[in-house]
A protein has these predicted regions:
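Histidine/acidic residue-rich metal-binding segments in metalloenzymes
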Residues: 134-301
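Metal-associated gating/positioning segment near the N- to mid-region
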Residues: 50-115
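Divalent metal-coordination and catalytic microenvironments
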Residues: 8, 26, 49, 60, ...
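His/Asp/Glu-enriched, well-ordered alpha-helical/loop segment
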Residues: 199-227, 294-295, 299-301, 306-381
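C-terminal cap of metal-dependent C-N hydrolases
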Residues: 8, 316-319, 373-425
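Alpha-helix-loop-beta-strand connector modules within alpha/beta enzyme cores
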Residues: 102-119, 168-178, 329
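N-terminal metal-binding scaffold of metallo-dependent hydrolase/deaminase domains
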Residues: 1-39, 50
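Active-site mouth loops of central-metabolism enzymes
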Residues: 59-72, 121-133, 153, 202-207
Length: 425
C-alpha cells in the first residue's frame, strides 16, 4: 500500500513545517514538496491546514475483553481509539481471566490479533488474580509479551510484595504502572471528600488514600531502581511527592487524565457520568495538576477510558460503576480548554499524548522522517462540533463532556501504513 498525504503541516519534533509525505510498506518513505502521485493507492490533501503528527498513544485504557464484552470489546474500543487519532493503546488487566499467566494472557492476545484496529499492547497483572495482595505473577514468563505490569483498579497493599515486584521488574527492565490507593483510607467513599461531598450527604475518598501509596512506592523505586509509573494522579499532594522524587533521581513518571485537568468537584452533578476513580478533586488539586504539567512533573495525559453499560451508569453518584469513556473526547476537550485558552501550547499537548508515552514505555520514537513507522494522525484544529455520546464508536456513553462545544477533530488515522480511520471526504 502506497499513500500520499499532500500539503500537511508536519510535526518535526518541536514545531511544524509544510510538506508532502509519502508512505509505503508501512513506513514513511519520503518528505518533500510536490511529490508525484504516480502509483499511489490513496491520496489525501491536508490543504495546508491540517497537522500531521505521530499517532497518539494512550497508556491507560480498559477494553474489557475477555470477560466483560457487554461493556466494550477490543474491536469497538480500538475502533474508538482509531477514530480519535490513536495508533497505540495499552490495555489494563482488569479482565476475566486476569492476564496473570501466559495462558490467560494468550486468551487476550488472541482477541487482539483477531479484532484490533490499531496496536493494542496488554499489561499483565502484578498479582495473581489482580487482587493487589497474595501471590505475585511469574514476571519472567510474562515479560516478553507485555508492555508492563499493573494491578490497575487495585493498589498493591503490602509493601514487601511491592518491593519484590519492583526488584523483579527492574531485572527485566519493565515498567510497573501503579494504581495508587490505600484501602484502609477509602472508608467506603466514591467521590472526593470535599465540599460537594459534605453538602450533599455523600461518602468521600480522601486525598491521602492516593498520595500515601505514591510516597511509599517512590521510596521503593528509589531503593530498587525499578521504573515506576503512577496511573491517573489527581491530588496536589501526589504532584508534590512525584516532583520531589524526580528531583532526587527516582525513576518515576506519571500520568493524569483530561477530566482532572479541566474539571473539579465543583462541576459534579448527581449523575453517574461524573463518577470515576480517582474522583474529580478540588479546584486547588486541578490547579496543582496544571502546574505539574507545566513544569514537567506530569509526563503523560492518558484517558483511563473505562466503558460500562448504560444500566451500570444510571444509578447516580452513589450507585453507579466507577469509570467514564475518554478516547473520543481527549484531544478536542484538551485542545479547546487548554490550548485555545493559552494554558498549554499545542506542541506540549502533542508531547504528552504522542511523544512522551512512547519514551516511557519503550515504543518506537514518534517522528515524521524517512524510515519511521507510518503510524500517524491528521488533526483539524478548526473544526467545531458538539460532543454527542450517541455518535461514539465506543460502546460506552458515560462522559462528563456530553453536550460540550469543542474545537479540534481527528481527520485521518494511519497505522502501519494502512488507513484505519478517515473523515476527510
Amino acid at each position: 500500500m502506497t499513500l500520499l498525504i499532500q500539503n500537511a503541516r508536519c510535526w518535526n519534533g518541536g514545531g511544524f513545517h509544510t510538506a508532502d509525505v509519502l508512505l509505503q510498506g508501512g513506513k514513511i518513505k519520503s518528505l518533500g514538496t510536490s511529490i508525484s502521485s504516480d502509483g499511489v493507492n490513496a491520496l489525501f490533501d491536508a490543504r495546508g491546514q491540517y497537522f500531521l503528527i505521530p499517532g497518539f498513544v494512550d497508556v491507560h485504557v480498559h477494553l474489557r475483553e475477555p470477560g466483560f464484552s457487554y461493556k466494550e470489546t477490543i474491536a469497538t474500543g480500538s475502533g474508538a481509539a482509531a477514530a480519535a487519532g490513536y495508533t497505540t493503546v495499552c490495555a489494563m488487566p482488569n479482565l476475566t481471566p486476569a492476564p496473570d499467566t501466559p495462558a490467560h494472557l494468550a486468551e487476550e492476545q488472541a482477541i487482539i490479533d483477531r479484532d484490533a484496529k490499531i496496536q493494542v499492547l496488554p499489561f499483565a497483572s502484578i498479582t495473581k488474580g489482580r487482587k493487589g495482595s497474595g501471590e505475585l505473577v511469574d514476571f519472567e514468563a510474562l515479560s516478553p509479551k507485555v508492555v508492563g505490569f499493573s494491578d490497575d483498579g487495585c493498589g498493591v497493599q503490602d509493601e514487601g510484595l511491592m518491593r519484590e515486584a519492583m526488584v523483579r521488574c527492574k531485572a527485566l527492565n519493565k515498567v510497573i504502572s501503579a494504581h495508587c490507593e490505600v484501602n484502609d483510607l477509602l472508608n467506603g467513599g466514591y467521590i472526593h471528600d470535599g465540599a460537594y461531598c459534605k453538602a450533599n450527604g455523600h461518602r468521600g475518598i480522601s486525598s491521602a488514600s492516593e498520595w500515601k501509596m505514591i510516597e511509599r512506592d517512590c521510596r521503593l523505586a528509589s531503593d530498587t531502581g525499578c521504573r515506576y509509573h503512577v496511573c491517573h494522579i489527581s491530588t496536589k499532594e501526589s504532584v508534590e511527592v512525584i516532583r520531589e522524587a524526580k528531583k532526587s533521581g527516582v525513576p518515576v513518571t506519571c500520568e493524569t487524565g483530561p477530566h482532572y485537568l479541566v474539571l473539579c468537584d465543583e462541576d459534579l452533578q448527581e449523575d453517574g457520568r461524573f463518577k470515576m476513580n480517582p474522583p474529580l478533586r478540588s479546584r486547588s488539586d486541578r490547579e496543582a495538576l496544571l502546574e505539574g504539567v507545566a513544569d514537567g512533573t506530569v509526563d503523560v495525559i492518558a484517558t483511563d477510558h473505562a466503558p460500562h453499560s448504560a444500566a451500570e451508569k444510571e444509578k447516580g453518584l452513589s450507585g453507579s460503576a466507577m469509570g467514564i469513556v475518554g478516547l473520543e473526547t481527549a484531544f478536542p476537550v484538551l485542545y479547546t480548554k487548554l490550548v485555545r485558552t493559552g494554558v498549554m501550547t499545542f506542541e506540549k499537548l502533542i508531547q504528552m499524548m504522542a511523544v512522551r508515552p512512547r519514551e516511557i514505555f519503550d515504543l518506537p520514537v514518534g517522528e515524521i522522517v524517512p524510515g519511521a513507522p507510518a503510524d500517524l494522525c491528521l488533526l483539524d484544529t478548526d473544526c467545531n462540533w458538539t460532543v454527542d455520546p450517541d455518535k461514539f464508536v465506543t460502546m460506552g456513553r458515560a462522559t462528563p463532556f456530553a453536550g460540550w462545544q469543542v474545537q479540534g477533530k481527528n481527520r485521518l488515522t494511519v497505522w502501519r501504513g494502512e488507513v484505519v480511520y478517515e473523515a476527510l471526504r
